[in-house]
Amino acid sequence: MGKKVINLVYTIAIIFLILSFACGIIAFGELGYSLFWAFVFGCAFVYLSIKLTLILHELGHAFCGYLTGYRLVSLGIGRFLLVKKSGKFYFSRTAVFKNVSAQYIGIKEDESDQRIILMLSGGLLVHLCLMLLAILFGFLTQTWYFAAIWIILNLSLFLTNALPIGITDGAKIWELWQSPENVNYAYMSLRHSAQTILAPEECDLKDFVMPVSENAQGFFAENMLVQQGQVFLLEGKLKEAKQQFQSILEQTDNSLIQAIAQMSLLHIALLEDKVETAEEYASILKLKPFLSLKMTHIQTMQAWYQYKVKKDLAKTHKAIQIAKEKMNASYLLRDEKRYYENWLAKLEKALSEGI
C-alpha cells in the first residue's frame, strides 16, 4: 500500500475522531447545557466512549477466539491486564509499548487451525456492529448527534485497525491471508506471550524460537527472527546477534520490528564499548519513546548507556532503580531475567569500585 494512501487513511481517521468530539459537544448543547458544560461533558463522554470501545474491541477478539477454541490468557487496556490463571481471574499491571492501547492474548491447542484469522477479525467486527447499532439507535430515538459519536468514532477506529501496516489487526490478517504458512510463527508468538504472563520462570526465550524460511515476510515471521537474535544476545553470541539484527533492518518496513532491532544493536554496542555507535542508535528519534519505557530490559540498557556514554551517574542510578522495581512486571522469561540481573549486578559492581 502506497505511503500517500496510508497518510490519507490516517488523515481521514483523525478527522473522524475530531468530528466525534464535535458531535459530543453539540449533543450536550442540544440538551440545554451552556457552551462550557457542553464542552466538558461532550469531551468526557467521547473519551469514555473511546475507552469502552477499546474494551469491546478486545472482547471481540476474545469472543471470536472462544468460538474457534482459544483459551483466554489475558485481556487488557492500557497498563491494566485481566489475567486468567488456574481458572481464576486477577488484575496485573504492565508496561505499554508505543501504539498498543489494548490487548488480548489467547492460546490454542490445535495450532494447525487456520481460523486464527477469525480471532484476529473480532475487533474489526465489533466496530462494524457498533456502527450498525448506533445507526439503529439514531433511527429509533432521532438523537442523531449521540448516534453520530459512535458511528464516526467506530469508523475512525475501524480504519486505523484495518489498515494493513505495522502491527494492526489488518496487517496480521493480511499477512496470514497472503502467507498461510506464517500461522506457525503466529501461534509461537501467542504461546510466548502467554508464557511470559502465566509462568515466565518455567521457560527460556530459546524455547520460543523456530526456523524461519528464507522468503518469509510479515510481522509474525520477522518477530521470530527478532527472538532468535535476542537468544544469540542472551547467549553472548554478539557477532551472530549483530548479523541477525542488521539483516532484519535491511528487509523489514515494520516500525516496531525496526525499533526492536535498533535497540538490540544499541545493546550490542554498549557490550562492545562502542560509545559512538551507541550514541548514534540512541539519538534515533523514533527510538526515544521506546527507550523511556519502564521495563527491566530497557532500563538496564538505559542505565549502561547513561553510565558509559553520557557519564551521568544520577540518571544511571535512577535507571537501575526502575529496572529492579519492574523486574516482575516486565514479564521476562527465565533466561532473560537471569541475564538482566547479572548485567545489572555488573554495573553496580563497576559503580561501587568507581570504574
Kindly label every feature range from the protein language model:
Residues 321-355:
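Terminal, low-structured helical/coil segments at or just beyond the last alpha-helical repeat
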Residues 107-198:
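Hydrophobic transmembrane alpha-helical segments that form the core helix bundle
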Residues 220, 224, 261, 298-299, ...:
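The tetratricopeptide repeat
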Residues 226-236, 246-309:
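Alpha-helical adaptor scaffolds
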Residues 67, 104-110, 165-233, 237-240, ...:
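Polar-ligand-bearing catalytic/cofactor-coordination segments
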Residues 45-108:
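Small-residue-rich helix-interface/hinge motifs
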Residues 1-46:
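Topogenic membrane-insertion module of multi-pass membrane proteins
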Residues 203-215, 238-250, 274-289, 312-326, ...:
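Alpha-helical repeat scaffolds
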